[in-house]
């Protein structure tokens, strides 16, 4: 056998470089823990994250509990993700306080956390990629007020009172109505856990209790679809304003059952989350908030290219 020391050295160096590259690829693992999977919204966020993973050459996983009521399950998922010692992680909190002990653990282990969609009550996240939910819900209030003639009774069917999105959308809507429309009375705020069946039942009970109700705001995809179904089942004429999109909501707007809705930019949220996580692993400075934008859409602009770009089925 002819031994070539130079060749052996080259092979050795190549193998070492290969190992380093493999280790680096393994290090660049970024898990995203979302609030759920039951809404098409989260599938759209995932598609943005997957695209960013391709563009930035990192490995991304995307998971969430079956429903947005499963706070404990989400915490378990977060714990498992941190245990894998990822390069960074993305987190959309169901309960903005419940996750704090684990987020402190991530911080102690120098794992950058990027909050997305729903922030947490802490300065641990290096940034939050999200819609300005208070401003978006305030716009929803303006639209609903105009549609009912700026007077009468309205209600809110919210998805929860524990997440940042749930609180901000509720408060943004309620505060705007109270400050700008003195002749409009918010008769009740009810919670349907973002589940369309629960939100349907909540809506029906509201309609029974308030026969003069003129409008309802549903704060996310499941809530809004539940409101539409409840109003349809009760055969009532009520102005409905929703949030997010999805086929059922879009169909309701086209048919006139729903007046319009606020859409976020879910693909953009997913993309910017992974992009920010990659930058955080490199020590790059990030803004505290990455505002991913929102739009009002109704029958008049649902087919506008600017709007169709941020809608999903």
Predicted regions located by residue number:
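A residue-level marker of the well-folded mature domains of exported/periplasmic proteins
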Residues: 3, 23-313
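C-terminal segment of classical bacterial N-terminal signal peptides
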Residues: 15-24
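Bacterial N-terminal signal peptides that target proteins for export
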Residues: 1-11
């Amino acid at each position: 056998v002819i031994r070539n020391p130079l060749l052996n050295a080259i092979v050795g160096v190549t193998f070492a470089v290969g190992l380093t590259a493999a280790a680096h690829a393994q290090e660049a693992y970024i898990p995203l823990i979302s609030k759920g999977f039951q809404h098409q919204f989260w599938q759209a966020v995932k598609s943005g994250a997957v695209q960013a993973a391709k563009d930035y050459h990192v490995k991304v996983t995307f998971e969430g509990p079956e429903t947005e009521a499963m706070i404990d399950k989400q915490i378990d998922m977060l714990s498992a993700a941190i245990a894998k010692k990822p390069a960074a992680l993305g987190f959309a909190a169901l309960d903005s306080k419940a996750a704090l002990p684990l987020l402190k653990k991530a911080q102690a282990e120098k794992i950058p956390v990027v909050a997305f969609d729903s922030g947490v009550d802490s300065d641990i996240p290096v940034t939050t990629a999200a819609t300005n939910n208070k401003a978006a819900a305030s716009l929803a209030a303006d639209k609903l007020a105009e549609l009912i003639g700026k007077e009468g009774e309205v209600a809110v069917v919210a998805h929860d009172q524990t997440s940042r999105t749930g609180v901000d959308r509720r408060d943004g809507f309620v505060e705007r109505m109270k400050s700008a429309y003195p002749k409009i009375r918010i008769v009740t705020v009810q919670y349907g856990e973002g589940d369309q069946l629960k939100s349907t039942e909540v809506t029906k009970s509201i309609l029974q209790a308030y026969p003069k109700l003129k409008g309802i705001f549903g704060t996310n995809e499941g809530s809004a679809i539940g409101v539409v179904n409840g109003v349809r089942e009760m055969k009532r004429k009520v102005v409905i304003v929703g949030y997010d999109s999805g086929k059922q909501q879009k169909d309701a707007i086209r048919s006139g059952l729903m007046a319009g809705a606020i859409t976020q930019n879910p693909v953009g949220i997913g993309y910017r989350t992974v992009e920010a996580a990659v930058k955080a692993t490199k020590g790059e400075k990030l803004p505290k908030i990455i505002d991913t934008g929102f739009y009002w859409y109704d029958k008049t602009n649902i087919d506008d290219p600017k709007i169709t770009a941020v809608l999903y089925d």
